[in-house]
C-alpha cells in the first residue's frame, strides 16, 4: 500500500511537460507549460472553505483563517495539502503579499519550513533541475510595510526580492531594509505590475512563480493578465460569513471562464478536494488591492 497522503489526480487536460517527482510514493508528477518569453508562469496556491472563504480580517493573532479553514493538523487531508504546497515550492520561486508576511512572523517560503518534517528530497529535486537550494522569496508590498527582522529577510541562503512602489521604496529605506533586492514600479496599474514581472524574469531569472496569496494579490495579478492558473484546496469546513468582518472569497472560476485541468483527492476516504484551474487571458484594474499591501 502506498503513502495514504499521496493525492490521486484525475487529468482532464494536458497541463504541460512533466516536471517529475522527488518521491513517487508521496507525490505524483505534475506538468507545467513553458513560461511566456517575457515573464514568469504564475500559479496561485490557496486553501478555501467548503463555501469559498479564503480569509477574513483577524481579530487578533490567534484568529487565523487558514488554520481554521484547514482544521485538525493531524488529518491526512491536511498533511496532503501541506505536502502539495511544499512540492509546488520546488517548481521555481515563491511569492506572497506583505499582509501575509506581517500576519505570519515565522513564515519562510521554502520546501521545508523550520517546523516541518525533514524533506531533503525536495531540495535534491530542485538542485537536480538546476535551481538554487531555496526558492527566491518575493514579497509584494505597495507601501513597504515589511518587518525588517522577518525571517524571509534574515534567514541565511534565502534570497528575498521586494516588489514595491516609489513610496514603498522610501519606507523600506526608512526601515533600513538593505539586503533584499528591490523592484520598483507603479504596481497599482496593470502595466506597472506587468513591468515588474518582466524584470523578475529578465533580472532575476524567475521562470515559474508560486503565489501563495493573499487573495488581494492574486486578484491584482489576475486583473493584470498575469495569473495563469490556480491550485485550490477545498476543505470540508463551512465558515459562518456573518461571524467575521472583511471576508474574502476565492474566484468564481466558472464565471472567470477558467478550465478545470486536474482534480485530486485522497483515496479511499479523503474529504478535501484538490483542483487545478487554468485561466484564459484577462484584463482590468489592480487599484482595489492597495489597502492590504
Question: Which residues are covered by each model-predicted region?
Answer:
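Enzymes that bind and transform nitrogen-containing heteroaromatic metabolites
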Residues: 1-293
Amino acid at each position: 500500500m502506498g503513502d495514504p497522503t499521496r493525492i490521486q489526480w484525475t487529468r482532464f487536460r494536458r497541463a504541460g511537460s512533466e516536471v517529475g517527482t522527488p518521491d513517487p510514493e508521496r507525490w505524483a508528477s505534475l506538468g507545467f507549460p513553458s513560461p511566456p518569453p517575457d515573464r514568469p508562469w504564475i500559479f496561485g496556491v490557496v486553501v478555501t472553505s467548503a463555501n469559498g472563504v479564503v480569509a477574513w480580517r483577524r481579530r487578533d493573532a490567534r484568529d487565523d483563517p487558514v488554520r481554521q479553514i484547514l482544521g485538525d493538523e493531524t488529518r491526512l487531508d491536511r498533511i496532503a495539502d501541506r505536502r502539495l504546497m511544499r512540492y509546488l515550492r520546488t517548481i521555481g520561486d515563491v511569492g506572497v503579499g506583505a499582509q501575509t508576511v506581517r500576519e505570519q512572523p515565522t513564515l519562510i517560503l521554502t520546501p521545508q519550513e523550520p517546523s516541518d518534517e525533514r524533506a531533503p528530497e525536495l531540495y535534491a529535486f530542485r538542485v537536480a533541475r538546476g535551481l538554487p537550494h531555496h526558492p527566491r522569496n518575493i514579497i509584494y508590498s505597495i507601501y513597504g510595510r515589511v518587518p525588517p527582522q522577518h525571517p524571509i529577510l534574515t534567514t541565511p541562503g534565502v534570497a528575498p526580492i521586494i516588489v514595491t512602489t516609489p513610496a514603498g521604496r522610501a519606507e523600506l529605506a526608512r526601515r533600513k531594509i538593505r539586503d533584499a533586492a528591490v523592484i520598483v514600479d507603479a504596481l497599482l496599474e496593470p502595466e506597472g505590475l506587468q513591468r515588474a514581472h518582466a524584470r523578475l524574469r529578465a533580472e532575476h531569472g524567475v521562470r515559474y512563480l508560486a503565489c501563495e496569496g493573499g487573495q488581494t494579490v492574486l486578484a491584482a495579478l489576475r486583473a493584470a493578465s498575469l495569473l495563469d492558473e490556480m491550485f485550490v484546496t477545498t476543505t470540508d469546513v463551512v465558515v459562518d460569513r456573518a461571524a467575521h468582518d472583511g471576508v474574502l472569497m476565492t474566484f468564481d472560476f466558472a464565471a472567470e471562464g477558467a478550465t478545470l485541468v486536474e482534480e485530486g483527492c485522497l483515496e479511499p476516504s479523503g474529504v478535501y478536494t484538490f483542483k487545478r484551474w487554468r485561466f484564459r487571458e484577462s484584463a482590468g484594474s489592480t487599484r482595489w488591492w492597495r489597502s492590504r499591501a
